[in-house]
Regions:
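Aromatic-lined substrate-binding rim segments of carbohydrate-active enzymes
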Residues: 32-107, 164-191
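Aromatic-rich peripheral "rim/lid" segments of glycoside hydrolase catalytic domains that contact
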Residues: 125, 284, 288, 292-432
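Conserved, mostly hydrophobic/aromatic
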Residues: 15, 42, 50, 81, ...
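Short, acidic/polar
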Residues: 27-43, 125-133, 198-211, 279-288
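Active-site groove signature of glycoside hydrolases
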Residues: 48-56, 93-118, 126-165
Length: 432
């Protein structure tokens, strides 16, 4: 259930936790001393939370076997974070991380089942959510669950072995896991996350309406390697304000005008930015995002660089951390630490009187999601408005036809982009 943010609630700043030792494989044999060292460094940067990613294959190697030791390890990491004043959000279905899929053997090859629609697959995932909820629900620093990290990528046409879904099937899967989270950990706020195919890829079963209406908050994952940096430049207005763009785009599809939005994942990829550019990109991205209404917080991807001793990662994945492999904060991490104290206090957002119209069908799905993606006419209208000094908002065509709804949002002027310039979006949520 959505809970509105108190007016005086501080903005939250955190990191997606990538263990410095053995990356996510650390979950196979947890070293709490190493985890504590990592958390100590993050707390020194002034962060207040982390998002963690226990591996699905470690937690649930068989559909009816949820390993008690693995569940205990998740609780131990949550408790360790609390020692350093860090709250913790826990992703359940991993699922997918940094180009690697972690799928239990009971779901693929000889046991292939669509994870979103097969009754046994869904019931197994529900059981995992409930078990983790029972283990974590009384932890004072447990923020809640994300159903899984960008799990919609498993349904995308760009995936090598997709499990396709309709919008109704995607909604049923999200709801089943969120309901399990609410039952098992009712005191926390639970969300789901998608990579940007939900916003930009036509025909994708996960839609903007689902992203903006289900769960306690809308989560936004912003990556400029999706064509934004390639088309406009890594330090362009389009790239610096891409996260803000997605935040404002999500607001157009929310039925609750005060729905909180969490910039849950954003990073500075080396295939789009030079090392010298990354601190400035972080600051520009964060400053643009905090100018939006009802922002819960920002969780940077990621906490620690990946060790070069680990093979086969896309090159950009090795250097996304705020902290290097030597345990020292990198320039990008130091910049984050420098601006957090200034930005933590919530300030009034600028008025957004200019509304860019997103044409939708009877189900509130954009008639052209490609138009919303980098280089599309809706995206370009945003870039042009920002370049001209405006702070634009978005409205659906349904809202644009409702004078009372426009007045409630303070929108006095509309732009209707010509959708004939739409492009077919085919970006993946990783680069391999």
């Amino acid at each position: 259930m959505t809970a509105h943010l108190p007016a005086d609630a501080p903005l939250r700043f955190g990191a997606n936790y990538t263990p410095s030792t053995e990356w996510m494989h650390a979950w196979m044999s947890l070293d709490l001393d190493a985890v504590r060292r990592d958390f100590a460094g993050l707390a020194e940067l002034g962060l207040d939370h982390v998002r963690i990613f226990p591996l699905w294959t470690v937690l649930q190697p068989n559909r009816t076997l949820i390993r008690e030791r693995a569940v205990d390890d998740v609780r131990a990491v949550v408790d360790a974070a609390g020692e350093f004043g860090l709250d913790v959000s826990v992703d359940v279905i991993q699922g997918h991380l940094s180009s690697f899929d972690f799928i239990p053997s009971w779901l693929f090859t000889w046991h292939d089942k669509n994870m979103f629609t097969h009754p046994d697959a869904v019931s197994g995932q529900v059981a995992l959510v409930e078990r983790l909820g029972a283990a974590l629900g009384d932890a004072g620093n447990f923020l809640g669950f994300t159903t899984g990290n960008e799990t919609n990528q498993f349904s995308a046409k760009t995936h090598p072995s997709p499990w396709p879904v309709t919008e109704a099937e995607a909604a049923a899967w999200i709801t089943a896991l969120l309901d399990a989270a609410d039952r098992s950990a009712p005191a926390q706020q639970h969300v789901h996350s998608e990579y940007d195919a939900a916003w930009y890829m036509d025909g994708h079963g996960f839609t903007p309406a689902l992203a903006s209406r289900l769960g306690a908050m809308t989560t936004v994952h912003s990556w400029i390697f999706n064509g934004t940096a390639q088309r406009y430049g890594g330090r362009s207005v389009a790239s610096d304000r891409h996260a803000e763009y997605m935040i404002e785009l999500s607001r157009a599809f929310a039925t609750d005008p005060r729905r909180p939005i969490w910039l849950q994942e954003v990073g500075a990829p080396s295939n789009c930015l030079t090392p010298d550019e990354t601190p400035g990109f972080l600051e520009a991205t964060v400053r643009a995002a905090v100018r939006t209404d009802d922002l819960w917080g920002i969780t940077w991807w990621c906490s620690h660089d990946v060790s070069r001793e680990l093979a086969d990662f896309p090159e950009l994945e090795y250097t996304l951390g705020l902290v290097g492999q030597d345990g020292a904060a990198k320039p990008i991490g130091r910049r984050f630490a420098e601006i957090i104290p200034e930005l933590r206090e919530r300030r009034p957002a600028p008025a957004r009187t200019l509304g860019i119209v997103v044409e939708v069908d009877d189900d509130d799905t954009p008639v052209s999601r490609g138009a919303l993606g980098p280089g599309g006419p809706v995206f370009q209208a945003w870039v042009d408005a920002c370049t001209g000094g405006a702070d634009p908002a978005f409205v659906t065509s349904r809202t644009a036809a409702d004078p009372a709804a426009l007045a409630a949002r303070g929108i006095t002027e509309l732009i209707r982009p010509d959708l004939r310039g739409a492009v077919d979006y085919a970006s993946q949520n990783t680069v391999v």
